[in-house]
Amino acid sequence: RTLRDLLREQHSKEDSERLMEQQGALLKRLAEADSEKARLLLLLQDKDKEVEELLQEIQCEKAQAKTASELSKSMESMRGHLQAQLRCKEAENSRLCMQIKNLERSGNQHKAEVEAIMEQLKEL
């Protein structure tokens, strides 16, 4: 064997070892990348679940806000209706008070007239 053959063989062996080391390093990096991918997939699933829960909360809050808005509108309508009824009752109350005062005044006038007539009858 010649020195050249031995050197070529040595270089080939070193190249082979270097390639094996590189392959090992690449396999290690691939395993780490696969592990990171699995971790990120789990994290993504957790985040997707969290997003779904938040969307459900938002839908629930929207429904509650809609219900509250409808209730508020209903209460405002009822308030307006009750205020109108109150104004009508106050007007009726005022009218009845005036009638009572007029009846009292009329009654007092009739009483005075009766007393005057009674005085006239006594004089006869």
Swiss-Prot record:
Subcellular location: Cytoplasm, Cytoskeleton, Microtubule organizing center, Centrosome; Cell projection, Cilium; Cytoplasm, Cytoskeleton, Microtubule organizing center, Centrosome, Centriole; Cytoplasm, Cytoskeleton, Spindle pole
Coiled coil: 13-124
Family affiliation: Belongs to the ODF2 family.
UniProtKB keywords: Cell projection, Cilium, Coiled coil, Cytoplasm, Cytoskeleton, Developmental protein, Differentiation, Flagellum, Microtubule, Phosphoprotein, Spermatogenesis
Domain of life: Eukaryota
Signal peptide limits: none
PTM comment: Tyrosine phosphorylated.
Function: Seems to be a major component of sperm tail outer dense fibers (ODF). ODFs are filamentous structures located on the outside of the axoneme in the midpiece and principal piece of the mammalian sperm tail and may help to maintain the passive elastic structures and elastic recoil of the sperm tail. May have a modulating influence on sperm motility. Functions as a general scaffold protein that is specifically localized at the distal/subdistal appendages of mother centrioles. Component of the centrosome matrix required for the localization of PLK1 and NIN to the centrosomes.
Protein name: Outer dense fiber protein 2
Major location (coarse): cytoplasm
Complex and partners: Self-associates. Associates with microtubules and forms a fibrillar structure partially linked to the microtubule network. Interacts through its C-terminus with PLK1. Interacts with ODF1. Interacts with MARK4; the interaction is required for localization of ODF2 to centrioles. Interacts with TSSK4. Interacts with AKNA. Interacts with QRICH2. Interacts with CFAP58. Interacts with BBOF1. Interacts with CCDC38. Interacts with CCDC42.
Known tissue expression: Detected in sperm flagella (at protein level).
Keyword RNA-binding attributed: no
Protein's GO biological process: cell differentiation; regulation of cilium assembly; spermatogenesis
PANTHER family listed in its UniProt record: OUTER DENSE FIBER OF SPERM TAILS 2 (PTHR23162), OUTER DENSE FIBER PROTEIN 2 (PTHR23162:SF8)
Phosphoprotein found in the keyword field: yes
CC annotations in GO: centriole; centrosome; cytoplasm; microtubule; sperm flagellum; sperm midpiece; sperm principal piece; spindle pole
